[in-house]
Design a protein with these regions (language model features):
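Short, small/polar-rich loop/turn modules that mediate ligand/substrate recognition or access, typified
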Residues: 113-118, 172-173
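Short, flexible catalytic-loop segment of classical short-chain dehydrogenase/reductase
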Residues: 23-24, 123-134
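C-terminal substrate-recognition "lid" of short-chain dehydrogenase/reductases
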Residues: 9, 151-178, 183
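A short, exposed helix-loop element centered on a Lys and neighboring polar residues
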Residues: 60-61, 106
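Conserved NAD(P)H cofactor-binding loop of Rossmann-fold oxidoreductase domains
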Residues: 19-26, 32, 180-181
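Active-site Tyr-X3-Lys motif and surrounding loop/helix of classical short-chain dehydrogenase/reductase
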Residues: 3-7, 26-50
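Catalytic loop of short-chain dehydrogenase/reductase
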Residues: 21, 34-44, 69, 73-100, ...
Length: 184
């Protein structure tokens, strides 16, 4: 993918790791009626870790390797983490992947600084998407009531944070929470 993008665009200087999936489920759940114990499947775990963490890691590796090979400077990687990295019930796999991505933001910033590549992350809270548009109205209202700015985020809110990471050459190794103050 990096080779193709480099060839088609005549070079690269930025990467936004924005792929992500959810496969929600409690790690362990006891059925109230039958007493049966259900466990989060390895497939559910692997799917989320594979896309949200492994995919971003391998793409970052290939991007930075290309920057080093071509002696391109400066460069920047933006990781899309999530405020869920602080822990969400029923999202062990998603939380682990997004927390690891935020941790790797710091690690990679330290590793890649010698190559002129900065790394930052943006951690969205709830954002208007087809998924949130389909939420039960009562649940949606309760969520909005808990957000100090009184609304669900918009894609434009995230873009402003991503744009900041891309453009501010003094920003490195940190994660910006864009959640309307929900996690403060």
């Amino acid at each position: 993918l990096v080779e193709l993008a480099h060839k088609q665009m005549g070079g690269l200087n930025g990467l936004i790791n924005n792929a992500g999936i959810l496969r929600d489920g409690l790690l362990v759940k006891k059925d109230r009626e039958t007493g049966a114990v259900k466990k989060l499947s390895k497939d559910q775990w692997d799917a989320v870790i594979g896309v949200n963490l492994t995919g971003a890691t391998l793409l970052t590796r290939d991007f930075v390797a290309k920057m080093v090979e071509t002696n391109t400077r400066p460069g920047v990687v933006v990781n899309m983490s999530s405020v869920a990295r602080h822990g969400n019930r029923g999202q062990s796999n998603y939380t682990a992947a997004k927390a690891a991505l935020a941790a790797n933001t710091v690690t990679w910033a330290r590793e890649f600084a010698a190559y002129g590549v900065r790394v930052g992350a943006v951690a969205p809270g709830m954002v208007e998407t087809p998924m949130t548009a389909g939420m039960n109205q009562k649940a949606r209202d309760a969520l909005v009531a808990a957000i100090p700015v009184g609304r669900i985020g918009l894609p434009e809110d995230l873009w402003l944070a991503v744009k900041f990471v891309l453009e501010c050459d003094y920003f490195n190794g940190r994660t910006i929470d864009v959640d309307g103050g929900l996690s403060m």
